[in-house]
Amino acid sequence: MPNAPAGGSAVQSFEISSMVRRAAANSYLCCPAEVLEILLAAGRLSNVKPTDDESADALAEAGLQLLRRAQDLDITEWALSIRTQPSLHDVPIDSRIHAGSAHRVAGALYILQAVPYVRALVPPDTRMALEDQLFHHLASVPDQDPNFKATTWPGFIAGAEASDPERQAWVRHRLQRTVRLVPWGFIYTALDTLDIIWGLRREGKTQEGWVQTLKDPDMNFLIV
């Protein structure tokens, strides 16, 4: 069973949570703070290596609880909370809901990749349904919308999940348009990483999931 954090780890987790929430409260480009907290927890679970069936079941259950937590997030409430910031009153709420929902759904997909044991506990069509939702939310935030720049990470997850060449091309073009608006270096890295993931998928090397594949020491790849 995944170990409970020691005292120092608990304090560190609290400090990280507080920092994340402060950042989210002061920037409309942030995804919902709770999504970031869920991703942090999922990343930690992805490093757990079960030693027997009991520990594998416990890991799957822990991942499932994270998945449910992500799916239960009230994105509308989060989107409306920006009205407490006078400088951000003009941010469109409808597209903010879609951007926040894209992060929530992308977080759920990340959990299924980072903790593959969870997949046995959800319906077989869960990933495809989440992928469809993610593309819907992304398509609802057009280039000219101020929330467009906030969809880079869920856009990357959409590309990583996509096996359909048309969807892959759609994500590539979206990220290329994003980088022309805001030439952030990590977007170039995201595009390069997607090429790697798609290439590995064509070779049949991502059965365990793209997160776990990229975490393989032989890949010499850093996953944050």
Placement of each model-derived feature along the sequence:
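Intrinsically disordered, low-complexity regulatory regions with latent secondary structure
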Residues: 175-224
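Cytosolic regulatory protein-protein interaction regions
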Residues: 3-152, 157-180
